[in-house]
């Protein structure tokens, strides 16, 4: 790494730090966008097997080129702006939806040294930036000049705000036990404790002592990304297709990409906050980025499994779950963790 920095400084001089930052951005965003594309392929394959079908198998070997074909098809489609729509906001809204999903990766650590911006308040940054995705959805529904799109946008806004509260309380618990807002520190703290000393690191991760918070965060993450069974914002049987009903071509594809990018982000954050990030589950295996990818893949599989298994919630059921079940659980467990930390049985010392 030092040789690379010296080489870059020799070529670019004082501009090298800015160039190096741009290179890191490309190295993170490009594979992530490719991962988003192939997550759609993985989803169709997994759900196909669950429904005793084959899934995509025509474009390329085993259908592996299907995501590229879908992207090219959408790229060649016309973006139709409805009459009566606010054209400027209609075009900008998809970009406002995907921008927070990409910007959040600036502080997501892949290892303790591989992170774009290792800032002390990275947890606060994540909570702030991810809450901005709802603006693109609200503006898309309003600018479309369609009752179905506007109704879907209002549903989505209420849903995302409701479940952000539960996710925020879950992360406050993580903050309490980690005593840090830095994501790298949050992972390193999970490698301490009695079980880690015995070589069973996975028992010292936050998922076990904060198990109710882990479940609340995971389920709220599914709701936050508008995925089944919480996809009332785009309920096909009720409001046609929700907030993006009037979109076509690449404008529609960007909303699609934003949804899957948010799925990957929630999987990464769940792995970092509760499952030890890049840490190995046992001491005799080395830590590394592959562990983080394995944990993310397992959580992404749960997203797909939920979609194939559960029917959609009614809107009132969804709101009741968020406000009358998750919020009380979070408040109770915050008190439990606080008392636990002040007691002689504190396991986070």
From Swiss-Prot:
Keywords assigned by UniProt, alphabetized: Cell inner membrane, Cell membrane, Membrane, NAD, Quinone, Translocase, Transmembrane, Transmembrane helix, Ubiquinone
Function (record text): NDH-1 shuttles electrons from NADH, via FMN and iron-sulfur (Fe-S) centers, to quinones in the respiratory chain. The immediate electron acceptor for the enzyme in this species is believed to be ubiquinone. Couples the redox reaction to proton translocation (for every two electrons transferred, four hydrogen ions are translocated across the cytoplasmic membrane), and thus conserves the redox energy in a proton gradient. This subunit may bind ubiquinone.
Family: Belongs to the complex I subunit 1 family.
E.C. number(s) listed in UniProt: 7.1.1.-
Topology class, membrane: Multi-pass membrane protein
Entry-linked PANTHER family: NADH DEHYDROGENASE SUBUNIT 1, NADH-UBIQUINONE OXIDOREDUCTASE CHAIN 1
Gene Ontology cellular-component annotations: plasma membrane
Subunit structure: NDH-1 is composed of 14 different subunits. Subunits NuoA, H, J, K, L, M, N constitute the membrane sector of the complex.
Subcellular location: Cell inner membrane
Gene Ontology biological-process annotations: aerobic respiration
Catalytic activity annotation: a quinone + NADH + 5 H(+)(in) = a quinol + NAD(+) + 4 H(+)(out)
Keyword Transmembrane found: yes
InterPro entries: NADH_UbQ_OxRdtase_su1/FPO (IPR001694), NADH_UbQ_OxRdtase_su1_CS (IPR018086)
Name listed for the protein in its UniProt record: NADH-quinone oxidoreductase subunit H
Keyword Repressor annotated: no
Transmembrane segments: 20-42, 88-108, 123-143, 167-187, 202-222, 249-269, 284-304, 325-345
GO molecular function: NADH dehydrogenase activity; oxidoreductase activity, acting on NAD(P)H, quinone or similar compound as acceptor; quinone binding
Main location: membrane
């Amino acid at each position: 790494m030092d040789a690379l920095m010296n080489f870059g400084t020799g070529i670019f001089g004082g501009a090298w730090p800015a160039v190096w930052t741009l290179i890191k951005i490309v190295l993170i965003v490009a594979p992530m966008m490719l991962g988003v594309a192939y997550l759609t392929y993985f989803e169709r394959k997994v759900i196909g097997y669950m429904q005793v079908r084959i899934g995509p198998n025509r474009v390329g070997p085993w259908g592996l080129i299907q995501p590229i074909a879908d992207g090219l098809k959408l790229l060649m489609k016309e973006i139709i702006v409805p009459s009566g729509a606010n054209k400027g906001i209609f075009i900008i809204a998809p970009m406002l939806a995907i921008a927070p999903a990409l910007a959040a990766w600036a502080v997501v650590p892949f290892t303790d040294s591989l992170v774009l911006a290792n800032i002390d308040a990275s947890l606060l940054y994540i909570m702030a930036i991810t809450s901005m995705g709802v603006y693109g959805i609200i503006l898309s529904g309003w600018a479309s000049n369609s009752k179905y799109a506007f109704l879907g946008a209002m549903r989505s806004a209420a849903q995302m705000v409701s479940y952000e509260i539960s996710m925020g309380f879950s992360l406050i618990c993580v903050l309490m036990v980690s005593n840090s807002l830095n994501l790298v520190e949050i992972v390193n703290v999970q490698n301490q404790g009695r079980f880690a000393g015995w070589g069973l690191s996975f028992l010292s991760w936050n998922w076990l002592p904060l198990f109710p918070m882990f479940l609340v965060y995971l389920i709220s993450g599914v709701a936050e990304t508008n995925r089944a069974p919480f996809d009332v914002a785009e309920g096909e049987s009720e409001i046609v297709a929700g907030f993006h009903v009037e979109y076509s071509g690449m404008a529609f594809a960007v909303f699609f990409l934003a949804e899957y990018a948010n799925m990957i982000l929630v999987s990464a954050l769940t792995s970092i906050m509760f499952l030890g990030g890049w840490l190995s589950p046992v001491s005799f295996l080395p830590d590394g980025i592959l562990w983080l990818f394995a944990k993310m893949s397992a959580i992404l599989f749960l997203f797909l499994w939920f979609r194939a298994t559960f029917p959609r919630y009614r809107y009132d059921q969804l709101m009741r779950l968020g406000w009358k079940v998750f919020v009380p659980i979070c408040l109770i467990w915050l008190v439990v963790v606080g008392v636990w930390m002040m007691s002689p049985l504190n396991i986070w010392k």
